[in-house]
Structures are given as structure tokens and as C-alpha cells.
Regions:
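Conserved, mostly hydrophobic/aromatic
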Residues: 29, 33, 41, 60, ...
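Acidic (Asp/Glu)-rich catalytic clusters
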Residues: 30-31, 57-65, 88-98, 178-179, ...
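Alpha-helix-loop-beta-strand connector modules within alpha/beta enzyme cores
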Residues: 50-73, 125, 353-366
């Protein structure tokens, strides 16, 4: 069981303060008994104010000693895969294997213009980028002769054997992950039925590929393949550990969910209904398409109601019941809980501590 930190930019919050608070939340999650913590990545918007999940993961790894830390996700469409592999290798080696790299395709946002990677690579190049990333994480040397990357063989220094997790919100990306034997990161924007269907599709695609495994070492663990938080397909064990997914030979899939505990379910739902729209409305509006297409739209109130009804939001007993229900319906045994929903840092830390004390003991044996 882990925590998922979007570094949410609630109105009035300073971005630097939010980032410092995110690192503190991970340290508190370690004290509370969580297995891992996952950090989101966004550019040029208040939805999430961390532009480099891997960089902040390095800070968090330096502040902790046991907890695994992962990216949910590093956006591969705006990064050179070998550069990201080198950064992941540093974090893996220096942390003693506590880092897990989660990657995603991202969305058709203005990021593609700013970083110069372009819409064509976003639309056609994710598979090539992912294969190059996996090669750099699983070999002493790496080279490329593809549509988007071409370079001579070079040594990978430091070498590392890592298997990334792939954020999946679409059937093609589910198939892509399955064919490579890479675990999926499933977003909190879908319910148990959709997650179960995606896991079934993954198994079918994996069997069709002959069980081929092109990733690195087993285990570990999330944009859509978009962000595991808001999960638009327009477009989180710590490092190297088995994620503990249920079912037959599922390779450590991870599911993101909202996690918020209060004395009563009514109070928990009321607090999130009051707080989350203040963040989600301007945050989701910050997604600016690079090519002038209409931006994403969502009924914010209905979305918050869905999150509260679907995920571990409520009394300790209800939170445990929702976690157990998801495990039974999907086979997922590794959930990462978005704990920032109240928009208040002190409440976030209290939420993490209460989840660790009052909920985790009820679900450890699932």
C-alpha cells in the first residue's frame, strides 16, 4: 500500500511550499508504515506543481531510509528515453533499490511545443521511446535506429536493471505494456469494473505475445496515457520489488485511488466535496492543447462525487471495505492513495497518519 502525491496546487498555495510539503508527506508516510510513495509530474499548470517527478523523488529518497519512492509518472513524450534511464539508474543505485520508474505518454499539451519534442512523437513515438528506455535500463550499451531516435552504441553509466511501470488508460497502451511484460499503473478516474476489464485485456495481450518479457528486473510499480490522477487518454513495492498484484502472474499492476479518512464517512465526503473543486476546476483547465483542439472538460462536482463513492473515502471501516472490494473485483493488491484531497498540509499529514494507524492494519492480509 502506498501514497500518491500530485503536489496539488490549491488556490493560495506557493508552489515551492507545496513541493517541500510533498517531501514531508513522504517522510510521514514512511513513519506511518506505507510501503511506497509515488510522485506525479506536470508542467505549466496548478493541477500539479512538480515539473520533475524524478528530481523530487531523489530529494524524498534522501529524506527517508525504508520507503520506496516512484514516479507516477515521468512523461516520456517530453524526455529523451536514455536521459531518463540515466536519471533512474542514479536513483536506483544510490538509494539501494528503493526507486521505481513509472512512465506515461502524457497528453497533447503545450509541453510538446516548449520542449521541442512535437506532436508526431507524442502520437506515434511512445512505443519506440518505451523500447529505448527499457533497453537502456537492461543493457550495458544502447543504440537506436528508429524513426525518432538514431545514435551509435554508447555505454550506459551507471548500469541498472529496472522495469518501468506504464500508465495505461487506453487499449493500445494496455497491449503495448502487456507485450513488453511491463506492469500497468491504472488511474483513479475509473472504477473497479473498468480496471478489471483492462487487466483482462492485459492478460489476453500478454498470452498473445507468448508471455514475452522485454523489460528489466521483475517487480516495482502513475500520463495516457495520461495522468494517473485525472486520467485522460489524450494523450504506483519500491524499485525492483514485486507489486503484489492479484490474479495469475499479473506483474505488479498498481492502482491509484483517493484515500481520505475521517471519524465518519459523512464528514470525509463533505470535506472533499468542499475542498477538491477549488483545486480541480482551475487545475484541469490548465491543460492547454498544443494544436488548438478543444481542451478537456469535466463536470467537477460529479467527478468528486464519483471519487468519494468509488475510493477509500470515509470512516476507517469504510476505507478498508473499499480497498477490499477493489482487491476482490480486480485482483489489485497494490493501491496508491492520493492523500492531498483536503488541500491543507496539516490535514494531509493527519490523513496519512490515520490511514497508517487505522486502515492499513485492516487490509494487510488481503
Amino acid at each position: 500500500m502506498g501514497v500518491f502525491l500530485i503536489a496539488a496546487g490549491f488556490p493560495g498555495r506557493d508552489a515551492g511550499e507545496v513541493l517541500r510539503d510533498t517531501v514531508e508527506a513522504i517522510a510521514v508516510a514512511e513513519e506511518a508504515g506505507f510501503d511506497d510513495a509515488w510522485i506525479a509530474e506536470h508542467h505549466f499548470m496548478s493541477y500539479g506543481v512538480c515539473p520533475s517527478a524524478a528530481t523530487l523523488a531523489g530529494v524524498a529518497l534522501g529524506r527517508t531510509s525504508r520507503i520506496g519512492v516512484g514516479t507516477a509518472v515521468s512523461v516520456l513524450s517530453t524526455r529523451h528515453p536514455v536521459d531518463l534511464a540515466e536519471q533512474a539508474a542514479i536513483l536506483d543505485r544510490v538509494s539501494g533499490g528503493r526507486f521505481t520508474l513509472g512512465v506515461g505518454r502524457g497528453g497533447p499539451w503545450v509541453d510538446l511545443e516548449v520542449f521541442g519534442t512535437g506532436l508526431e512523437r507524442f502520437e506515434r513515438g511512445f512505443g519506440e521511446s518505451l523500447d529505448l528506455l527499457c533497453a537502456a535500463l537492461d543493457a550495458g550499451t544502447v543504440s537506436a535506429e528508429g524513426e525518432f531516435f538514431r545514435f551509435r552504441p554508447v555505454p550506459v553509466v551507471p548500469p541498472a536493471r529496472l522495469r518501468p511501470v506504464v500508465a495505461c488508460t487506453s487499449a493500445p497502451t494496455v497491449a503495448l505494456a502487456a507485450e513488453r511484460g511491463l506492469p500497468m499503473l491504472l488511474g483513479m478516474h475509473i472504477g473497479d469494473a473498468e480496471r478489471a476489464a483492462m487487466i483482462r485485456s492485459y492478460r489476453t495481450a500478454s498470452e498473445g505475445a507468448g508471455g514475452e518479457r522485454r523489460g528489466g528486473r521483475d517487480g516495482g510499480l502513475g500520463n495516457g496515457d495520461g495522468d494517473p490522477g485525472e486520467g485522460r487518454d489524450v494523450g504506483p513495492g519500491g524499485g525492483g520489488r514485486d507489486g503484489g498484484a492479484g490474479g495469475d502472474a499479473d506483474p505488479g499492476h498498481v492502482g491509484a485511488a483517493v484515500g481520505y479518512v475521517a471519524d465518519t464517512t459523512e464528514r470525509a465526503v463533505r470535506e472533499l466535496r468542499e475542498a477538491m473543486p477549488r483545486w480541480l476546476a482551475p487545475g484541469l483547465a490548465g491543460h492547454v492543447p498544443v494544436d488548438g483542439r478543444p481542451g478537456p472538460r469535466r463536470d467537477i462536482g460529479a467527478y468528486v462525487d464519483f471519487l468519494c463513492d468509488t475510493h477509500p473515502v470515509g470512516s476507517p471501516g469504510r476505507c478498508a471495505e473499499r480497498i477490499a472490494r477493489t482487491a476482490g473485483a480486480t485482483g489489485l493488491r497494490h493501491l496508491i492513495l492520493m492523500v492531498e484531497g483536503a488541500g491543507d498540509h496539516a490535514r494531509t499529514l493527519d490523513n496519512i497518519r490515520r490511514l497508517g494507524e487505522q486502515v492499513l492494519p485492516l487490509v494487510r492480509d488481503l
